[in-house]
Amino acid sequence: MYEEEKYEYICMRCGKKVRLDINEDPIRCTHCGFRLVMKPRHPVPRRYKAR
């Protein structure tokens, strides 16, 4: 049929990293059940301001 596409998200409530299948209907945190999860950002090098 189709391959499982699992992506890593971060829960907005408990802060844990969760691997979710995006084809699954309710996208929820597997630890606390919260519905809002976000994709983690890549680390960005900081630019220091000149003084």
Curated annotation (Swiss-Prot):
Belongs to the archaeal Rpo12/eukaryotic RPC10 RNA polymerase subunit family. One of its GO terms (biological process) is DNA-templated transcription. It catalyses: RNA(n) + a ribonucleoside 5'-triphosphate = RNA(n+1) + diphosphate. Pfam families: Zn_ribbon_RPAB4. One of its GO terms (molecular function) is zinc ion binding. It comes from Methanopyrus kandleri (strain AV19 / DSM 6324 / JCM 9639 / NBRC 100938). Part of the RNA polymerase complex. Its EC number is 2.7.7.6. The gene is rpo12. It is found in: Cytoplasm. This is DNA-directed RNA polymerase subunit Rpo12. Keywords: Cytoplasm, DNA-directed RNA polymerase, Metal-binding, Nucleotidyltransferase, Transcription, Transferase, Zinc.
